Every structure is written in C-alpha cells, then in structure tokens.
Amino acid sequence: KKFINNQNFKISDFSNHSHLDYKNIDAQSTGFKNNSFDFIISSNMIHHLPYPLKFFEEMHRILKNKGKLIIFDAHCSVLLQSILILMRHEGFDFTKNVWNSKEPATDINDLWSGNSAIPYLIFNDEKKFNYYLGSKFKIKYKKLCECTLFLNSGGVTSKTFYIPMNFFF
C-alpha cells in the first residue's frame, strides 16, 4: 500500500494482519457483491487454492464488466522443484486435475499448504484453459520469471538446516 497511492486500492488475504483492508477472505468465496472491482491482483496465491476453478468463477462474479484479473505466481521449473524438495516447503503434484471442482488440488485442511504445480497446470495448456475459462477470461500476457522471485516474495518459510551467520560474528 505504501507504493500505490490510491484510496480505492485495497488489500486482502486469508489472514488477520492489521495492514489488510479485508481480513480472512477465501478467494474461492469472497462474500463481495457482484461486479465490485475493476482490477483484481492475485499475488503468489493460486498455488494455495484447493479448487482453482472455483476461484476463477468467483473472480468473474466480483469483477466488473471488462474488469481485469492479474495473476502472478511461481512457475514450477525443475530448479524450483529441486529447491522445494531441499527446503521441504509446500510441494508440487502434476497429477492433480485443477479443472475438477470436486477433487482438491491442495490440502483443504491446511490452506497454507501449496501445490506449486497449479499455475503450470492452469496456464501451460491454453487450449484447456480456453475450454474451461475462455468464455470468462483470456490470457493476454504470459511470461516466465526466475523462481527466486517467488522464494523471496515473503511467504516462504524453510525447514532446511542452516547455520545462523550472526553466530560467528
């Protein structure tokens, strides 16, 4: 919020942090009125969604006509997969069907768990994306970014062994 100076800019999350305008919001069922937003930005959260299709349906419902949904999330490259294995953080499962609204793609009992394969499964096959969502959304721009951006985004915790450097200094 300190970088975007606009009174209409609001921040939400599935948490109760004091800096949030909307707290404990389930992105698959927000409770917002229809046609409420011109823009929605989804930052590194798609991979946490048990039912991605429900998310897109909800975003379509709450976006105004000609509204824009901007999504950025990790690309589950071989490098990211290796790092996730080493860190024992979240995980990836390419066998999940992200288009099934009955079978979860992540652990529904732990919304902080993640399946880092979800963005790949949604956006890599544009024919499938268009089949399921083409009447509501179009992919206008897609770019792969270095996975360390995701790892340094602030939401990653590691269970990897490390030696605190301040111990030596």
Describe each region flagged by the PLM:
Residues 1-30, 54:
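Class I SAM-dependent methyltransferase SAM/SAH-binding core
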Residues 41:
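A conserved beta-strand element that flanks and buttresses the S-adenosyl-L-methionine
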Residues 44-48:
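Short catalytic micro-motifs in class I SAM-dependent methyltransferases
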Residues 50-54, 79:
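Short N-terminal helix/helix-N-cap motif within the alpha/beta-hydrolase-1
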Residues 53-68:
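A short glycine-rich, Lys/Arg-flanked "PGG" loop and its adjoining helix->strand segment in the class I
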Residues 69-106:
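Conserved class I S-adenosyl-L-methionine
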Residues 108-127:
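Acceptor-substrate binding/catalytic loop of class I
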Residues 127-136, 140-169:
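A C-terminal cap/extension of S-adenosyl-L-methionine-dependent methyltransferases
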